[in-house]
Amino acid sequence: MENLRRAVHPNKDNSRRVEHILKLWVIEAKDLPAKKKYLCELCLDDVLYARTTGKLKTDNVFWGEHFEFHNLPPLRTVTVHLYRETDKKKKKERNSYLGLVSLPAASVAGRQFVEKWYPVVTPNPKGGKGPGPMIRIKARYQTITILPMEMYKEFAEHITNHYLGLCAALEPILSAKTKEEMASALVHILQSTGKVKDFLTDLMMSEVDRCGDNEHLIFRENTLATKAIEEYLKLVGQKYLQDALGEFIKALYESDENCEVDPSKCSAADLPEHQGNLKMCCELAFCKIINSYCVFPRELKEVFASWRQECSSRGRPDISERLISASLFLRFLCPAIMSPSLFNLLQEYPDDRTARTLTLIAKVTQNLANFAKFGSKEEYMSFMNQFLEHEWTNMQRFLLEISNPETLSNTAGFEGYIDLGRELSSLHSLLWEAVSQLDQSIVSKLGPLPRILRDVHTALSTPGSGQLPGTNDLASTPGSGSSSVSAGLQKMVIENDLSGLIDFTRLPSPTPENKDLFFVTRSSGVQPSPARSSSYSEANEPDLQMANGSKSLSMVDLQDARTLDGEAGSPVGPEALPADGQVPATQLVAGWPARAAPVSLAGLATVRRAVPTPTTPGTSEGAPGRPQLLAPLSFQNPVYQMAAGLPLSPRGLGDSGSEGHSSLSSHSNSEELAAAAKLGSFSTAAEELARRPGELARRQMSLTEKGGQPTVPRQNSAGPQRRIDQPPPPPPPPPPAPRGRTPPTMLSTLQYPRPSSGTLASASPDWAGPGTRLRQQSSSSKGDSPELKPRALHKQGPSPVSPNALDRTAAWLLTMNAQLLEDEGLGPDPPHRDRLRSKEELSQAEKDLAVLQDKLRISTKKLEEYETLFKCQEETTQKLVLEYQARLEEGEERLRRQQEDKDVQMKGIISRLMSVEEELKKDHAEMQAAVDSKQKIIDAQEKRIASLDAANARLMSALTQLKERYSMRARNGVSPTNPTKLQITENGEFRNSSNC
């Protein structure tokens, strides 16, 4: 998304801009009918931006959802529309719209959040029936003015180097909310500048020193250190959080498991089941966490490893484990488990049961991270103590793994985007307000910070002051006769193919690999004030050995173009030239050595700013006490120290050169220098010619019409633009080298400097074929100081590159003008003319032969150079292929290891589930055995009861028989002499023992 924005606004970082940010919470609604689901839609200036989830009405409708929008257009109103979710089964229920809440953007503008109950404006208000529905909304709308990055350079450098003293001075006076905002800005800025690891380590060690022996207080107070690590965890750990807990949290949202284990909130019969559910959920959560080490962010590993190393060096290695566990679990993982919507794991706020389950899981996880058991305060959780003790060793192993510096290469780095300008602007506004509240004694300890803040505040208060000169229209040069020519050149350059350029405006967010992209300061040896340039060396590009041994190309110069042009003492352009439009060549010696001919206005206008030559001999040596100038983009740029003709700097590009003429080149070959030296005999002719500008101009125009350079064909700019993080295309093989031209292969492998304004205009060279000539732009230094002249001449000595078209034209024009003066009687005396011509013809023939021999040697040398260059390109291409092959293999290996880690994780989960299943089976078997044994006892008792019942029945029948027999004898009057004796046998039967 950021790349799309930069495509629309490529000059964003180098121009003054305004950012609009809205943060809004839709919290809850009241006075709505019950047993319905309600949702809200968020519209900004009548454009739908977001929608809440549907929530069921209980006491109130609670959403608790937050939304954050950046890069907004200027807002007038924020509207929240309230809807009732329609039941799809009831077709008659069509009208689900209930009303709206309209907030003027100005009412919530500022740094503080505004939280209020807002009445819902309904389409059909019902008067006299009590208050209508209301929605509680918390919102903040900010308009942030952001200056160009150049304006924040000193501020950012000061923050990067003096953050510790700043935090110590501001800590006592800041509120908790301000600390949070300041810590967020500092973390984002230092992440961009590559100093965040040192920043967090220094803050943590100061926090350890402050707490002393009270280790339990670390990360439990609202300090800048706590807020900083919180923000850093959110910044680099968002993807890790999603990978580690995203699926688990989503599964909990969808499940209906009840994990309430508080006896006061659930029945005793359900308690064992709920305890089992909670234990299972905690096991799964911790299993997810300890197996997430393979996707743990590399930056966090580096920070934790730095903490462990620093604690060991201070003689307190035991506290490093507490630091790591407290920061990761207390400030990141456990809050994310409790409130997934705040950490963007899910949008919806959980219902009551899910929220309670998440809270209990977070309690167990936090106790596990603290290596503590549940006590009397939460006695109902004591059943989890066995689980905690069992997992302590795994927790220690996990903490050791995520702080092990030896496994840093196995994990990915931060891939997000940071708007550095916005963060610097936010930090400036916070510091501007905070520093004004400090005592003067404390302010004096902050060094240059108050002055830097005042400078930035002045730039913010002055509209238009933040616009860099390089961001203006490159073709807008008033009062210059070459304005149309410059405009044509700019148009031609914009339409050229830009696929070979490094696009500075589309660089990815800084990482440890490319963190030097931002604020890499290099001071120039010839500038009175430090001139810094942002540089970047791409690892994927072929290494080109520059003339000065450097392999890094400076892409943007942060110096003011108009300042450089104005420091020479006199402006360079048509308004600074004499009235006849000519400057004697003797006055141009600083810019073009070994030239002794007048230069017309038409030729000089093409290099008006590219070669700002002094117009008087006095100024050519540099005024005393006046700073000497540098070449465009400063002379540190190795692209200006190469032997071949190189493109003009972006600063001089917009108003130099034309479509029909080549720009001047300071690289002259040996024969041109020799020819120019031999023309000294025509000095009187040159002086006479200087007094006749009209005829010379006419002849030069006729010469241009006869042998002028054809216009270079324009190329469509719709070709693909390669980003810096993409591999470069393989270099094409060099075509046959035409006579007197620089082949494109000498320039095709160069990385041309990107314009500091971020526009698409570039100085990419074109090779249009036999009918065109290569544009060679000037690379001479602007107003070189006398000390730099010998070195510059040494670097720009004889070169195998042939002179460009304008150099050859100037030499030939000088010869033609001398011949013209001879014909008109201005040369030597006529009697000596014939003798002179014969000698000149002979010397000319010898000279032509020598020139041809030199050209042959030069051509042979060029051919050898091209062969060498082609071999170097082949080797470079082969190296790139091997490098990408190695990267591919490394990526495959990393994916394989990650897959293995995932497999191990799944196997661990499966083994845990199998062990749980085995335990359940074992418990079931034991219970079944107990039931079987009890059943056997019951069966035996039932048999015994049945036998007793049978014996009892027989006894009763025997008694009945005896009673009947006794009664019969009594009725017959017979008294028994010998009463019958009954005896019970062993089998329970009665036996009569009488003799009868």
Curated annotation (Swiss-Prot):
Q: Which GO BP terms sit in this record?
A: angiogenesis; cell motility involved in cerebral cortex radial glia guided migration; cellular response to epidermal growth factor stimulus; cellular response to interleukin-1; cellular response to lipopolysaccharide; cellular response to tumor necrosis factor; cellular response to vascular endothelial growth factor stimulus; extrinsic apoptotic signaling pathway via death domain receptors
Q: What compartments host this protein?
A: Cytoplasm; Cell membrane; Membrane; Cell projection, Dendrite
Q: Which Gene Ontology cellular component annotation is one that this UniProt entry carries?
A: climbing fiber
Coiled-coil parts of chain: 832-966
Q: Where is this region: Disordered?
A: 460-486, 522-545, 611-630, 650-672, 702-805, 822-841, 971-996
Q: Which portions of the chain have biased composition (kind: Basic and acidic residues)?
A: 830-841
GO MF assignments: 14-3-3 protein binding; death receptor binding; GTPase activator activity; identical protein binding; kinase binding; mitogen-activated protein kinase kinase binding; mitogen-activated protein kinase kinase kinase binding; phosphatidylinositol 3-kinase binding
Q: Residues in domain C2?
A: 1-118
Task: Please quote what the entry notes about the protein's domains.
Answer: Exists in a closed inactive form by an intramolecular interaction between the N- and the C-terminal domains. The proline-rich motif is critical both for PI3K-AKT activity inhibition and MAP3K5 activation. The PH and C2 domains are necessary for the binding to phosphatidylinositol phosphate. The Ras-GAP domain is necessary for its tumor-suppressive function. The C2 and Ras-GAP domains constitutively bind to MAP3K5 and facilitate the release of 14-3-3 proteins from MAP3K5.
Q: What does this protein do?
A: Functions as a scaffold protein implicated in the regulation of a large spectrum of both general and specialized signaling pathways. Involved in several processes such as innate immune response, inflammation and cell growth inhibition, apoptosis, cell survival, angiogenesis, cell migration and maturation. Also plays a role in cell cycle checkpoint control; reduces G1 phase cyclin levels resulting in G0/G1 cell cycle arrest. Mediates signal transduction by receptor-mediated inflammatory signals, such as the tumor necrosis factor (TNF), interferon (IFN) or lipopolysaccharide (LPS).
Q: What is this protein called?
A: Disabled homolog 2-interacting protein
State the organism of origin: Rattus norvegicus
Q: Lineage in the entry?
A: Eukaryota, Metazoa, Chordata, Craniata, Vertebrata
Recorded name of the encoding gene: Dab2ip
